[in-house]
Design a protein with these regions (language model features):
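Generic beta-sheet signal
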Residues: 3, 136-142
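Acidic, low-complexity terminal tails and accessory targeting/binding regions
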Residues: 68-72, 78-91, 130, 134-136, ...
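Active-site signature of alpha/beta-hydrolase-fold catalytic machinery across serine-
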Residues: 61, 149-153
Length: 201
């Protein structure tokens, strides 16, 4: 089974009290517009998404291009889902330097129950792998923290947040018939390189 882990596109910022579930920004929608063509050569048979809007809105064009429905699985939600506000990672450095430093060192935010989060992510990936046929290609639309946890579990990295996972990046995994996972590519961004915030300075 082939599994694509796609991070959501650039979302709007939410304000305190609005929750951590914003829609995509205009820039994010431009990023998403490139995904169907970028993934066209792969025989995607199933599209699964986090319940958060920024992930669903990233998944929808890919599913529509194949006549598939977007399946929602709460377990693919990011660690921030219950927070009162969403702040894009690029802004955290200036607004919360202490939390930024913690994340830059590879740790989840201080408010996150790491064991519970890792267990949730591990369970949903195991479920996707065990319910898929060997020939299936599944595209999961999720979040940077979730994707890092998956890679951490497979590769045994020293830190949970070991990889930079860009907006609309594609991480590709393969699962053997026995369920053994291997990492093929991480954070593929060729299709949106020029639209990423870090490349527009």
């Amino acid at each position: 089974m082939q599994l694509f882990l796609v991070r959501h596109a650039l979302p709007l910022r939410s304000e305190p009290g609005q929750g951590a579930d914003p829609d995509l920004s205009e820039e994010g929608r431009a990023q998403v517009a490139r995904l169907p063509e970028a993934l066209a050569r792969f025989p995607i048979t199933r599209v699964v998404s986090s319940p958060q809007r920024r992930a669903i809105q990233t998944a929808e064009p890919v599913a529509a291009a194949r006549g598939l429905t977007v399946e929602i699985d709460d377990r693919f939600a990011e660690y921030d889902r219950d927070l009162p506000v969403y702040i894009p990672i690029e802004q955290i450095r200036d607004e919360n330097p202490q939390e930024w430093a913690r994340m830059a060192q590879g740790h989840l935010p201080s408010s996150v129950d790491e064991d519970a989060f890792r267990a949730r992510v591990r369970a949903v990936v195991d479920n996707v792998a065990t319910t898929a046929e060997h020939e299936d290609t599944v595209a999961v639309f999720s979040h940077g923290g979730v994707i890092n946890v998956v890679l951490h579990e497979i590769l045994g990295t020293r830190r949970v947040l070991s990889f930079p996972i860009d907006y609309v990046s594609v991480t590709r995994l393969l699962f053997s018939r026995s369920g053994q996972a291997s990492v093929v590519t991480v954070n593929g961004t060729e299709h949106v390189w020029d639209l990423l915030p870090r490349n527009q300075r």
